[in-house]
Amino acid sequence: MADQRMDISSTISDFMSPGPTDLLSGSLSTSGVDCNRKRKGSATDYQESMDTDKDDPHGRLEYAEHQGRIKNAREAHSQIEKRRRDKMNSFIDELASLVPTCNAMSRKLDKLTVLRMAVQHMKTLRGATNPYTEANYKPTSLSDDELKHLILRAADGFLFVVGCDRGKILFVSESVFKILNYSQNDLIGQSLFDYLHPKDIAKVKEQLSSSDTAPRERLIDAKTGLPVKTDITPGPSRLCSGARRSFFCRMKCNRPSVKVEDKDFASTCSKKKADRKSFCTIHSTGYLKSWPPTKMGLDEDSEPDNEGCNLSCLVAIGRLHSHMVPQPVNGEIRVKSMEYVSRHAIDGKFVFVDQRATAILAYLPQELLGTSCYEYFHQDDIGHLAECHRQVLQTREKITTNCYKFKIKDGSFITLRSRWFSFMNPWTKEVEYIVSTNTVVLANVLEGGDPTFPQLTASPHSMDSMLPSGEGGPKRTHPTVPGIPGGTRAGAGKIGRMIAEEIMEIHRIRGSSPSSCGSSPLNITSTPPPDASSPGGKKILNGGTPDIPSAGLLPGQAQETPGYPYSDSSSILGENPHIGIDMIDNDQGSSSPSNDEAAMAVIMSLLEADAGLGGPVDFSDLPWPL
């Protein structure tokens, strides 16, 4: 055991001795030098091989080819991207040319704006709420011809197709004969404008040629966030395919001419009545449609479109428009009354008519414009309506008329009740027009009465007082004019003009008075009663004011003779109360142009004396005794 321990210790000491350590370190250093030598040799060999490749023409050629392939690949990629961008830009430009809202812009839009406008346009055409396709709009069991006949039977009209460029009738259904009494062959190929009323041609041209270029909403630019300007650039307009159209027009009816018994009578009224007989009101409803020229089967000699676009046409159904006359209702159900709004000049002529009047009166708005409302009033109601006309021109309050009869297009009468009020220009203080809200009165309302509408006392003789003695009177008989239905008064259109001139004259005279300078010319009211010392109210003392016959008063309240509106002594005479007019005789015989001029001269002298501009007043020129 002791020997074994000694062997182990000697072995450990031999291992820990410095001799072997130096040997190990020497071997490690020798191996590191060998490695460095090997690394230096490999790097040198690689550099030499590279130099050899560069010096070799074949290697240099391969290097150049490698670099060229990389460059060509980059150029090919850029060319592909450029062609793709160019193609996309061309499609965007073509899409912008097809969208009407993009055509309306004065500058080039960005791509996002064009795409957004295109989406909005597609939603407008197809309908965002109820989209449908052509495959499910009709049952599969029905053919196109059967569907067309069913639609025409349900609509009780005729189908027609009109070219938008010239108004040429390209197609019309056979059912047009039931309405216009023209055959299908008579109308196809003809111009639609030849069968329209002259006053409706402009309206129909507007429906055919108007392109929806103006955007209906404010568009925002995607880049700037600012509203896009909608300046329409001049140029050929593009029709919007799918745009709906609905309008009224009068078309000729192929009816036999009615013989007039009195051939010598050739008045304007009879001609207008004959024109009305030969036209009927058609309500056209449809949409614009575009077809390629190859599908239309057009003549080869027809002129091609300048831009090579599709042929735009109006596809519509025309229905005979019949006015809606309310029928009496026997139940207790109360519905909203039918009414329409009209605007009149101060002489009673129509300047605006609501479209609802067509359903009530059967007149188109353009038929009523420029005509006097008195031409349609029943002759028994003209007196009361003339009084209301005077009142509405003199007051700012609303005037409600009694029930009166208004002549409709077929010659019959319907019962209306109107509310009138005048609009006064705030700058000129003059009445510009009269607004009338006309309500249809049913028969049961007339029998039971309606307490919601105040009643005015009618004046049966005021209608005759409106006309001169040579043209009308209380005992004058109303002649029947050929061509004009009974119930209306011939020459009634001048009544409104006479009332307007009368009110304007009163405004002019009152406007010349200093006391009325600060007040509106519409505030014409009756003056205070005359002094007790003036018998009968005909003689005014100390520069008093004679009573003015108010145009809105009833015959029992109106004065017998007209007078001039003078101001009282405190306003006209001022500090000279000793100057006055003792009496003014207002007899009928003393009213003449010379007397009126003399009276006005005296009034002007009084005004000058009051202002200190003139001398003493000479009353010798007065036609009345002082």
Curated annotation (Swiss-Prot):
A motif (Nuclear export signal 2) lies at residues 361-369. The keyword Ubl conjugation applies. Keywords: Acetylation, Activator, Biological rhythms, Cytoplasm, DNA-binding, Isopeptide bond, Nucleus, Phosphoprotein, Repeat, Transcription, Transcription regulation, Ubl conjugation. A motif (Nuclear localization signal) lies at residues 36-41. The modification Phosphothreonine is found at residue 21. CDD domains: bHLH-PAS_ARNTL_PASD3 (cd11438), PAS (cd00130). A motif (Nuclear export signal 1) lies at residues 142-152. GO terms for cellular component: aryl hydrocarbon receptor complex; chromatoid body; CLOCK-BMAL transcription complex; cytoplasm; nuclear body; nucleus; PML body; transcription regulator complex. Residues 1-58, 459-492, 511-595 are annotated as: Disordered. Residues 401-444 form the PAC domain. The modification Phosphoserine is found at residues 17, 78, 90. One of its GO terms (biological process) is negative regulation of fat cell differentiation. The record marks 125 as: Important for interaction with CLOCK. InterPro entries: bHLH_dom, Circadian_TF, HLH_DNA-bd_sf, Nuc_translocat, PAC, PAS, PAS-like_dom_sf, PAS_fold. This is Basic helix-loop-helix ARNT-like protein 1. It comes from Rattus norvegicus (Rat). The lineage of its organism: Eukaryota, Metazoa, Chordata, Craniata, Vertebrata.
